[in-house]
């Protein structure tokens, strides 16, 4: 539970907000809608060979039926965040994908943050069985075929899902914003070298639970995997929360009104607006 501000802070917050009301405005949020720049399916083999779907129209997650060997599929997607200015604060992130074929009912599809790089080659096939990998394709065993293998077959990713969505019939699905998705994208924006995207993991315990999603190669651009990112631009100095070039009582009012929560007033990005953030604001005071 977030710590509650003291009576002194509550009173100061009310006073500051009241004084700042005529001229205060929080930093304006911007929105970026980004389509995937790479998406592949990791195909678990049952014959010792490697299979890939680097340039296919679809990506898959879940477990296939007995005709496909009962093996697993995991969909990996990555987004280019360069359209979002460095230093921005991420406020919300949602992921949208179009599920275009299924033989099963509702099953959870989970997004896990990837922990290793991977490639997308030119391999193409219809269906989820895949084909022989091309150079730099990601497969179940290789993150870059044929030169580099995953530390763990099936991809290396955070065990805890960042977001979960129940996927049933054909249609669009949105993984709504949650703190873990925001944290993932903020980390990628702050350190682009670790932007390895997410892996979509379906129901891997039951046969015939695989879900087919349209990939970035789909002819229908509206079906491409997409993220919608809401963010605020970095202030000229930590503490200029309304972007007016000054750090004064107006900004203090905004910070104190957000006390105990998150958002742009979390100047040190530790997940909570508290005394540490107030200290940063005061150290940069510029009325």
Predicted regions and their residues:
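N-terminal secretory signal peptides that target proteins for export/translocation
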Residues: 1-8
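Bacterial N-terminal signal peptides
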Residues: 11-23
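Flexible, small-residue-rich N-terminal segments that precede or flank a structured functional core
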Residues: 28-83, 119, 204-207, 217-226, ...
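A short beta-strand element within beta-rich, extracytoplasmic domains
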Residues: 79, 89-101, 227
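Extended, low-complexity, turn-rich repeat/linker tracts enriched in Gly/Pro/Ser/Thr and Asp/Glu
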Residues: 98-107, 206-208
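Beta-strand-rich interaction/scaffold domains
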Residues: 102-187
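Ser/Thr/Pro-rich, low-complexity mucin-like regions
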Residues: 178-221, 230-233
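Alpha-helical segments with a strong preference for the paired helices of cellulosomal dockerin domains
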Residues: 241-262, 269-287
